[in-house]
Every structure is written in C-alpha cells, then in structure tokens.
C-alpha cells in the first residue's frame, strides 16, 4: 500500500513554489517540457489515468488517500474546467485526431469517462464534476462557470458567464 501511495502522490504532485517543474501548478494548470502550458495535453492524460486509479482502487486496501483525490478535483474543477466550453477545449494542440465520428468537434470527449469515474469516486464534489460533464455532453448557454479565473503560473485567463466565454493566453 505504501508503495502505491508514494507512486500516486508522485504522479499528482503539485508545484507549490516558483521553480519550473513538470507537474500540476499551484494555480491548477499543468506544465510539461519546462514552462509550457499543457493542461489539455499531458494534463488531460494525467487526469484520465489518475481518475482510473482513484476509481478502480476505491473501497480496497489500496484506495487513494483523500488528499490526492482533492488535488485531482482541484486540478479539474478549479483549473482545467475553465478551459472547456461545450465540446471546445481552448488551447488544444490538435496532435491527435478529433472525434468527428462520435459527434464531437474537438477533444473534450476525452474527459467524459474520467469525469464519470470522479463523480463516483469523489462524491463530495460529484455535483461539480457533473456540471463539467453536462457542459461537454449537452452544451447549453452556461458551462457552469460565472466569473474570472487566471492561471498566473501559465499566463492563461478565462472569463465565463451564461451565453459568453472568452479565454486568453
């Protein structure tokens, strides 16, 4: 159990100082290849993989500690979700093909299963994950956000409200 905990804590480490590290940043953005904003690239893969382990190991002797689950939730709900509106992901690099065959115009579809897993695995924030999931699967005038969010480590800003959203890098 200790080895599993240590590994998963390492995978979801949060960079708390101003040194460059490839990790989730204090502002809930994700760095890779130095100081490069990859929340919807490598960060998406990290969210997919970590949500799988959090989900699959829940209610076992190897279940992931609440601190890691909270960090995972913060990364999505307090960071990445500000980059998603409908099936559009802002700053998606397009190095993988879009999922036109299943009706999505961008890569946001990749978040559907991980969000479903987190709804089950993190019931205290299930409603927040559900809003992000609804935003992807059934886009409406709102993406569940209302206000401004600035990822100061990555220089990325979002302003969202019903019927309107703008992101700047």
Where do the protein language model's features map onto the residues?
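Extracellular polysaccharide-recognition and catalytic grooves
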Residues: 1-169
């Amino acid at each position: 159990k200790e080895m599993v905990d240590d590994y998963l804590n390492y995978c979801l480490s949060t960079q708390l100082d101003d040194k460059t590290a490839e990790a989730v940043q204090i502002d809930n953005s994700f760095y890779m290849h130095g100081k490069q904003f990859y929340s919807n690239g490598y960060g998406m893969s990290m969210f997919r993989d970590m949500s799988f382990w959090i989900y699959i190991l829940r209610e076992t002797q190897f279940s992931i500690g609440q601190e890691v689950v909270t960090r995972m939730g913060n990364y999505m709900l307090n960071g990445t979700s500000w980059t998603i509106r409908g099936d559009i992901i802002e700053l998606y690099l397009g190095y993988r093909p879009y999922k036109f065959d299943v009706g999505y115009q961008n890569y946001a579809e990749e978040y559907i299963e991980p969000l479903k897993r987190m709804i089950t695995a993190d019931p205290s924030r299930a409603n927040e994950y559900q809003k992000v999931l609804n935003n992807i699967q059934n886009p409406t005038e709102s993406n569940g956000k209302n206000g401004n969010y600035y990822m100061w480590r990555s220089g990325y800003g979002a302003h969202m409200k019903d019927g309107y959203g703008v992101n700047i890098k």
